Amino acid sequence: MSKFKSLLLLFGTLILLSGCSNIEIFNAKGPVASSQKFLILYSIVFMLVICFVVLGMFAIFIYKYSYNKNAESGKMHHNAIIETIWFVIPIIIVAALAIPTVKTLYDYEKPPKSEKDPMVVYAVSAGYKWFFAYPDEHIETVNTLTIPKDRPVVFKLQAMDTMTSFWIPQLGGQKYAMTGMTMNWTLEASQTGTFRGRNSNFNGEGFSRQTFKVNAVSQKDYDKWVKEVKGKKTLDQDTFDKQLLPSTPNKALEFNGTHMAFVDPAADPEYIFYAYKRFNFELKDPNFTSEENMFKDVSDKPLIPARKAQITNANYKRHGMKLMILGNDEPYNNEFKKDESKNAKEMKKISKDAQDQDNDDHGGGH
């Protein structure tokens, strides 16, 4: 067998083997992911049909109108029917792709329809880790998430250092978590199982390890798990601050109590820098620092007292937004949720005003 044929066979085998992998976005385990799967497959099939039609016509025209000795030069002239066809068909194609896409994107912003009330989980990214605070249950986990199946989960996304992207491929698409604000993202697991979650936004040398495990369980098993976690160590501020450091190893942890008892990351984006200071942690460029010197001077214990809850976000101060602190013995009730909603509406208004101002500055709003 020639070298070319061997390479061709090897290449063909690799293509076939790629179909054996478990592509997570096509292995949907929730309603949001299922609608995304349909949209992707619909778009692929639709565009393949267009490609086959265009390439088929291309082949026919090459064969039928190829040059030969008896060929006559064609005479170009106006044809209203043909011009209408090649003007209308692209519009139909764009509409057929755009309408379901836009509709699906707007549907993502609404919680999936369910008879059960949605539960709330604060998903906070920091130090190349994910922190999950359960305000109703007053428990917190690190790099692991447990949710009941068939119940919508409203994730309140926050970032304490760099911008990240929260993504559980088998449950739905990604959404950004940014400093100084809270973004809502609702997902639901329709089956029990263990899924992978990750930060899909490249944001530094620790990006690849910012992953977490998602356990979707029955409501009975979820209640049992919550009871077990409540019996574990209570999360104190020293422990939380140390976990914020990129130098602290990424491990799956579970705590009684939450960080919401002493910090609101959206209201206090400067909190993490104080945590760095407490443990003498300094950000260093990995390109110019040896591995042994990256975290050489980091203290194992805090050197200064813990920071009190406060507002350092200028937007919070300017617009009278409230500091959201929930003690471990305080209920996550309608009064707290009302203040949450008020902050969210104010932040949305700030974002819209900034966008309008940007449009005015660049002429995009006219």
Curated annotation (Swiss-Prot):
Sites of N-palmitoyl cysteine lipidation: 20
Keyword list, A-Z: Cell membrane, Electron transport, Lipoprotein, Membrane, Oxidoreductase, Palmitate, Respiratory chain, Signal, Transmembrane, Transmembrane helix, Transport
Residues lipid-modified (S-diacylglycerol cysteine): 20
Keyword Transmembrane: yes
InterPro entries: CcO_II (IPR045187), CcO_II-like_C (IPR002429), Cupredoxin (IPR008972), CuRO_UO_II (IPR034227), Cyt_c_oxidase_su2_TM_dom (IPR011759), Cyt_c_oxidase_su2_TM_sf (IPR036257), QoxA (IPR006332)
Coiled-coil regions, chain positions: none
Region (Disordered): 330-366
Enzyme Commission number, as recorded: 1.10.3.-
GO MF term list: copper ion binding; cytochrome bo3 ubiquinol oxidase activity; cytochrome-c oxidase activity; oxidoreductase activity, acting on diphenols and related substances as donors, oxygen as acceptor
Pfam hit, one: COX2_TM
Biased composition (Basic and acidic residues): 335-366
Transmembrane segments: 38-58, 80-100
Signal peptide range in chain numbering: 1-19
Protein's membrane topology: Multi-pass membrane protein
One example of a Gene Ontology biological process annotation: ATP synthesis coupled electron transport
Localisation per UniProt entry: Cell membrane
SUPFAM superfamilies hit by this protein: Cupredoxins, Cytochrome c oxidase subunit II-like, transmembrane region
Entry's family note: Belongs to the cytochrome c oxidase subunit 2 family.
Task performed by this protein: Catalyzes quinol oxidation with the concomitant reduction of oxygen to water. Subunit II transfers the electrons from a quinol to the binuclear center of the catalytic subunit I.
Name of this protein: Probable quinol oxidase subunit 2
Organism (species): Staphylococcus aureus (strain NCTC 8325 / PS 47)
